[in-house]
Every structure is written in structure tokens, then in C-alpha cells.
Swiss-Prot record:
It comes from Drosophila melanogaster. The gene is DJ-1alpha. The keyword Mitochondrion applies. The active site is at C133 (nucleophile). This is Protein DJ-1alpha. Expressed in testis (at protein level). Its main location: cytoplasm. Keywords: Cytoplasm, Mitochondrion, Nucleus, Oxidation. SUPFAM superfamilies: Class I glutamine amidotransferase-like.
């Protein structure tokens, strides 16, 4: 469940900023998703992904890249992670690791050795990895899925086209265990594709219908 709070935080974050506190579903039978949240992340890509996955009864852990302190995103929305990435990786395996985009957030993901370790571990187990907008370049930086079909925000294409089979004409691309998408406006389909892979097409369609969204698996 996501709830919007109004609260003051240090470092210039005021009551005027929206704060989203993430509370994990406690259903132990659910599939598990890890969303890594870095400062400067694209908040639509984060929020829609977390919300849609939870609507699909997927257990979502939101891990702050550096710690579990509030994270200011690209448009000054402030998100309170469930935990830190360091702590999240001690909690067991995840069925999917999700990377939201955002230029500053993606730069932090690219420069984090911890993110690289998580992604390589996930890839070695054949687990799903999902990246949207700028975040596929973090996959490239950490050596994930080289040669596979992917997409991204169009501005990222020059950094990716020599390493991957780049797809221009699809909003969401899946190649094996790698799911990629293009930007804020494609996040619903991105999150529904993850939902489909974890809990089935029928659940994904039911979630989409409840949101008045049309999803075609």
C-alpha cells in the first residue's frame, strides 16, 4: 500500500513536497520484487511500478540505494524506502529486480558496485531484471544481458545500440529474463508485463481492468 504524507524533512525538504511511504504486503506466499530507489529517480516510473505490482499481490520491497532515509526524486517527490539496499539483500531472493529511470537516479545506479553485484547475482540465477527509461544503460554498465533485445528512452539508444539488439517500435521488450521499457508513459505496460511474468496473464489483465487500463499480454 502506498500512502501520501505531508511532513518536514531536513536538507530543504518541506511540507510542500509530496512524500510517499511504502508499506510491504506481508503475504509470505507472494512473489517478491525488489525496487532499487536512487536519488533523482523518475517518480512516475517508481510509483506506478510499485503500485501495479502490489495490486497484483506481489510483495514489493523498496530499497534505498544508500540507506533508508527519504529519497528526493527528479520532480521533488520524496519517497521513504522500506529499507536500504544493503539490508534488502540479506532478506533472501527476489523474483524480480526493478530499476526505475531518471537521469540522476540512473547515474547513481550505474556508479554503484552494490547494484552491479545485485544484478549479476540475479542474472546468474535466471531471475527477472526489469529496467525502464534511462535504466537500461545501468544494465550495460554492469554487463547485464549483453546481446539481448532491449528498448529504452530514445535518448539512451546511442549508448545501447552497439551492445544490444535495440528495438525502436515497442513500448515494452522482453528477451528471456530481461524486461525493458521506454519512459514514464509506458510504465503501466512495463509493470503489467512484470506482473504477467510473476503471477500470470489473467492477474495482469484483472489488475489492468480495475485501473481502467487495456493490457494485451
Amino acid at each position: 500500500m502506498l500512502s501520501v504524507l505531508r511532513k518536514s524533512f531536513p536538507n530543504g525538504v518541506t511540507h510542500a513536497h509530496r512524500v510517499i511511504r511504502c508499506k510491504s504486503n506481508q503475504d509470505k506466499c507472494a512473489k517478491n520484487a525488489l525496487i532499487i530507489l536512487a536519488p533523482g529517480a523518475e517518480e512516475m516510473e517508481f510509483t506506478i511500478s510499485a503500485d501495479v505490482l502490489r495490486r497484483g499481490k506481489i510483495l514489493v520491497t523498496v530499497a534505498g540505494l544508500h540507506d533508508c532515509e527519504p529519497v528526493k526524486c527528479s520532480r521533488s517527490v520524496v519517497i521513504v524506502p522500506d529499507t536500504s539496499l544493503e539490508e534488502a539483500v540479506t532478506r533472501g531472493d527476489y523474483d524480480v529486480v526493478v530499476l526505475p529511470g531518471g537521469l540522476a537516479g540512473n547515474k547513481a545506479l550505474m556508479n554503484s558496485s552494490a547494484v552491479g553485484d545485485v544484478l549479476r547475482c540475479q542474472e546468474s540465477k535466471g531471475g527477472l531484471i526489469a529496467a525502464i527509461c534511462a535504466a537500461p544503460t545501468a544494465l550495460a554498465k554492469h554487463g547485464i544481458g549483453k546481446g539481448k533485445s532491449i528498448t529504452s528512452h530514445p535518448d539512451m539508444k546511442p549508448q545501447l545500440k552497439e551492445l544490444y539488439c535495440y528495438i525502436d517500435d515497442k513500448t515494452v521488450v522482453q528477451d528471456g529474463n530481461i524486461i525493458t521499457s521506454r519512459g514514464p508513459g509506458t510504465t503501466f505496460d512495463f509493470a503489467l508485463k512484470i506482473t504477467e511474468q510473476l503471477v500470470g496473464a489473467e492477474v495482469a489483465k484483472e489488475v489492468a481492468k480495475a485501473m481502467l487500463w487495456t493490457y494485451k499480454p
